[in-house]
Amino acid sequence: MKVAIVGASGYAGGELVRLLYHHSSAEVTCVTSRSLAGIPLSEVHPQLTGFSDLRFENPAPDAIDADVAFLAVPHTAAMTIAGKLLSRGIKVVDLSADYRLPKDTFEKVYGVTHTDYFPAPYGIPELHRKECINAKFVANPGCFPTGATLAAAPIASRAHTIIFDSKTGVSGAGDNPSATTHYPNVGDNVSPYKWTSHRHLAEMKQELSKLGSKAACYFTPHLVPVNRGILTTAHILLNEPLETKEVEKLYREYYKDEFFVRYQKPMLSAVRGSNFCDIMVESEGKRVVVVSAIDNLVKGASGQAIQNMNLMCGFKETDGLDAPGLLP
């Protein structure tokens, strides 16, 4: 099966190529970049030297030859491409935010007009597997909402307030240097940003609502001096008290059939480079604390995108993804 990665120069694009190298049925045959056409993929992603001889291309959407296309492009760019690919029978997984939210919500949160909106499955397979199976298009979730929603899902409907506090690695900001990600500003430091207004909060609220939760939801992210990973602490305030053993039983039962969700002490290093989400809970009266750990570039982006592709195309859900993390 031929795969195109549209916007392959960034971290997510590199991870897609790395992970798909191990897929039993998918072969990356096209990697695109508007500014790097003609340059070898391995020149931008040296970790792929010896694993791919592809060069970046800059084809028009109607010239892309593929069965599946991953859109690893900036927000607002996917809406100019997705429909054209779908009209040619190419299945699409969109890693941008363009189709994660209803049209009016997207336009309010991102401050732009959506020029080609259509509803799409929201690709957290553990929660929306049926919608993703055989789908022609899936909107891949944001990294923060993935870790947060998986942390809260089993107990969200019992809560009146949910507060997400996330620590994220610098790769989540992308590969364009900035003062925020400059080493002297990141090293030996922890800094909150967008304290009350991060755009991913809209996805979290959307997913909690789908889970039947009426809880008020709040979110604050922090940048920490690591390359990869998101550690999310969910403070879940319940309507009625639950003991830790009851909450633990509930979580174990909820995720018992989910290969990529493991009930164990969350550590960023244990999930680094993998598609796993590690979760553990503890409670005190009406307060439940849930901690989750994911790799923001894998379960938070490219790995989950491949997991969705597998569901869309009838492959084993773990194909290309069943490798452990990189501890230490």
From Swiss-Prot:
Which pathway does it serve?
Amino-acid biosynthesis; L-arginine biosynthesis; N(2)-acetyl-L-ornithine from L-glutamate: step 3/4
Provide GO CC annotations from the record. Answer: cytoplasm
For this protein, the record's Pfam families field holds: Semialdhyde_dh (PF01118), Semialdhyde_dhC_1 (PF22698)
Which keywords, in A-to-Z order, does the entry hold?
Amino-acid biosynthesis, Arginine biosynthesis, Cytoplasm, NADP, Oxidoreductase
Summarize the protein's role.
Catalyzes the NADPH-dependent reduction of N-acetyl-5-glutamyl phosphate to yield N-acetyl-L-glutamate 5-semialdehyde.
Species in which this protein is naturally found:
Methanoregula boonei (strain DSM 21154 / JCM 14090 / 6A8)
Read off the InterPro entries from this record: AGPR_AS (IPR023013), AGPR_type-1 (IPR000706), NAD(P)-bd_dom_sf (IPR036291), NAGSA_dehydrogenase (IPR050085), Semialdehyde_DH_NAD-bd (IPR000534)
Subcellular compartments: Cytoplasm
**EC number(s) given by UniProt:** 1.2.1.38
PANTHER family annotated for this entry? N-ACETYL-GAMMA-GLUTAMYL-PHOSPHATE REDUCTASE, CHLOROPLASTIC-RELATED, N-ACETYL-GAMMA-GLUTAMYL-PHOSPHATE REDUCTASE, CHLOROPLASTIC-RELATED-RELATED
Tell me a GO biological process for this protein.
Answer: L-arginine biosynthetic process
Q: Output the Gene Ontology terms for molecular function.
A: N-acetyl-gamma-glutamyl-phosphate reductase activity; NAD binding; NADP+ binding
What protein am I looking at? N-acetyl-gamma-glutamyl-phosphate reductase
Q: What class of enzyme is it?
A: oxidoreductase
Name of the gene:
argC
